[in-house]
Amino acid sequence: HTDLTGIFVPEHGLFGAVAAGDDVDGAEYKGVKVYSLYGAARRPTPAMLDSIDVMTVDIQDVGARHYTYVSTMAYAMEECAKAGKKFVVFDRPNPIGGLMEGPLLRQEQTSFIGLYPVPLRHGLTIGEYARYINDTQKLGLDLTVIPMKGWQRKMYWQDTGLPWVGTSPQIPTAATALYLSLIHI
């Protein structure tokens, strides 16, 4: 038996419709409390985590280092590790494939739009990135990655046969995810 006690949302909100940089207000969705992790709180607080046993992440990253969804996940992982909460990631395809390219982020440049020394086009799935964070940051998080089926590193989104759901107003198509990985902001 599972009870959904809270929904934690990243920069672009629950449905990916909030513009970049805009505040994401917490509210309720179908009677469940929604907590914004973009704005005043970028990390779940102990009070937010009190009512949960496990945090699940089912979010589509775009494969570019400066897209903030990985940072939001990383901060949630850190706080769940401190609080002794389990963490489950539902893996998803990297829409721009498994190729890594571009410069590595230098330590002095780290920020919310780039926390780790990975290439601009990082080539990882969200599940692989979660494992990378847990291992390299030595979080000791009770992490489970639910694997996906059928994706191969050479595949782009259009090769998956899956419908694309825009992750933000700036990424309405899978092709725009590739363009984002080609620029450095």
What are these regions (language model features)?
Residues 24-51, 64:
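Glycine-rich oxoanion-binding loops at beta->alpha junctions
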Residues 12-29:
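N-terminal beta-loop-helix "entrance" segment that forms/cooperates
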Residues 183-185:
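Conserved small/polar residues in nucleotide/adenosyl-binding loops
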Residues 16-20, 88-110:
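Glycine-rich, charge-decorated loop segments at or immediately adjacent to ligand/cofactor-binding or catalytic sites
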